[in-house]
Regions:
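SAM-dependent methyltransferase catalytic region
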Residues: 1-188
């Protein structure tokens, strides 16, 4: 069962689509991790990367523009809920390449020396250039393997961007201010 104690008083508990997420919360990377090679741990910032970090941040900023649409209402009626569903769908589509990047990064880390920094770098370039990620994935079976292995890992700042970011840049005190646990929590 699920206990939720926090809600907007006087309003129904609605639109949990964006709040309840399934995934491995211990092994997912944050966006900053995606700017490093998963095997070597080296930053992706050399001249050969052609300002890949800046382009990737710009693309993420464009995707995060959809967060405001999602947070524009509280879901007080059917029209509001429809608007939230549409906004959530647009946000998910915009963040999908970054979530794929996070899955591949995690899978590559899990593979260790069998992972491929080169395949990861090629995918980063594809995402930064806003190219079709599925075509790129199908051309490199190693990416599919890494994606499958890391697919359940939860990248918190890509799943809950409104909590961890403000206008596409990391906040100093970003994150959750809660502890979730099973009752009886008075015995912790």
């Amino acid at each position: 069962s699920l206990w939720i104690e926090s809600y907007a008083e006087g309003l129904p508990l609605t639109f949990l689509d964006h709040r309840l997420i399934r995934g491995d919360s211990l092994t997912g990377p944050f966006f900053e991790d995606l700017l490093t090679f998963p095997v070597s741990g080296e930053p992706i910032d050399d001249l050969f990367a052609q300002q890949i970090n800046e382009r990737l941040r710009k693309t993420l900023g464009e995707a995060l523009a959809h967060v405001n649409d999602l947070e524009a209402s509280v879901g007080k009626d059917v029209a509001d809920l429809e608007q939230k569903h549409t906004a959530k769908k647009r946000l998910d589509e915009a963040l999908s390449p970054f979530r794929m990047l996070a899955a591949v990064w995690s899978g590559c880390v899990m593979l260790g020396d069998r992972g491929s920094d080169l395949a990861y770098r090629n995918l980063v370039t594809t995402v930064a250039d806003q190219e079709n990620i599925d075509i790129h994935k199908s051309l490199q079976p190693a990416l599919q393997q890494m994606s499958d292995l890391g697919g359940q890992n939860l990248a918190y700042d890509l799943v809950f961007p409104e909590v961890f970011r403000l206008e596409g840049s990391p906040e100093r005190n970003a994150g959750f201010d809660s502890i979730l646990g099973n009752p009886p929590w008075d015995r912790i």
